[in-house]
Amino acid sequence: MARIHPLFTFTFPCAILRSTFMRREIVLDIETRNTFQDVGAYNPSLLKISLIGVYFYETDTFETFLEEDLPKLWPRLEKSDRIIGYNLLGFDYPCMQTYYTGDLMSLPTLDVMIEIEKRIGHRVKLDDVAKATLGVGKSGHGLMAVEYWKNGEIDKLRDYCLQDVRVTRDVYEHALKNGFVRYTDRQGVAQDVPMPIELPEPDQRTAINLSLGL
């Protein structure tokens, strides 16, 4: 079942940025049950989701959704003003799309990794961005999440995923507040990346409802 995680609270002064209106932005990250090696191809659509971790600005809560809970998540994504993630377009969305009856690419999305790539010409790992920008990194490498799933350590899996969600959110908030993020280059030097991001206009429309009411 979907679970709310009240112990995860703001570690970044976001409340001021939320004051103009109740933000309906969402930050998410997915974990999978298997690896590219398991499926024999670098194809995210072949992977099976174990869990999706989500931060909801509207309620200031972190929640996790197991595979069987995903129908409860889709309407909330459709009602959001913006979905934020790191490598959403290249990994999370292709994997999620096999579970979703609508078109995830039609939803308002900000992929922080792509925004950085546009400015510096190459991709950077979230861990390198988080450590340089926030002084805090990810909780580990992706294979750990697969092992947690295989070992039935669901609570560890939830914590692992939500740490990535929290780090992604805080990198995004840093860009909102300061207009830049940092990453560590191949020489180990921290580099600034200009990233002027504005809050989305609050969307007054009814939910897109591409998931057929599920």
Annotate the PLM regions:
Residues 2-214:
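DEDD superfamily 3′-5′ metal-dependent exonuclease/proofreading module
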